[in-house]
Amino acid sequence: MKLIEFGSRHSFYEWFRRCDRSDNYPLINFNYIHCWEEDTHIYRCVEKGKDVGVIFISCCYPGEMWIDLFEVKKGKHRTGIGTKMFRLLMEKHTPLYVKLECVEEEDKEKEAHHFWRKMGFHKTYDRTVLGDAFVKTYTKKYWKNYDKL
């Protein structure tokens, strides 16, 4: 498996528009408010010539990484791909702290939360976000001290 970094956000969006990928990931509205483009990194995760995942990170502060998107292709969950992706990411970036928000979606959150706990993350706080009048989304933020990997 290898991580292929997009040269810019523009090339990432062009890749989505061209459909030059083996899976149709949803185009997510990333939060760029606090980061310059040079502080963000977007990776395609490729195994045997096929896309198996996408990672989007922000490194706005020294020694800190924020995982904005960490997605394994549908149908590839629980096969070890996410663990490989995370280890490759940590080889490329060696932050002191890694932060992320893990959204709860009914039964799906159990799988995602289990994965991040397995990677050594710990819950640091909860907060409630109201989408529209009908939807409540719960998020959890995790941190990890890289020295304990």
Model-derived regions: residue spans:
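Short amphipathic alpha-helix that is part of the acyltransferase structural core
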Residues: M1-N31
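A short helix-loop-beta-strand connector motif used in the catalytic cores of GNAT acetyltransferases and
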Residues: I33-R44, W66
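Acidic, low-complexity, intrinsically disordered interaction modules
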Residues: W36, S58-W66, T124-L130, V135
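Conserved beta-strand in the GNAT
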Residues: R44, K50-C59, E64-E71
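Conserved acetyl-CoA-binding loop-helix of GNAT-fold acetyltransferases
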Residues: V72, R78-E91
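Short glycine/proline-centered loop/turn elements that form peptide/ligand docking sites
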Residues: F86, D107-A112, T128-V135
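Conserved GNAT acetyl-CoA-binding A-motif
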Residues: H93-E105
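Conserved active-site alpha-helix within GNAT-family acetyltransferase domains
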Residues: E104-D126
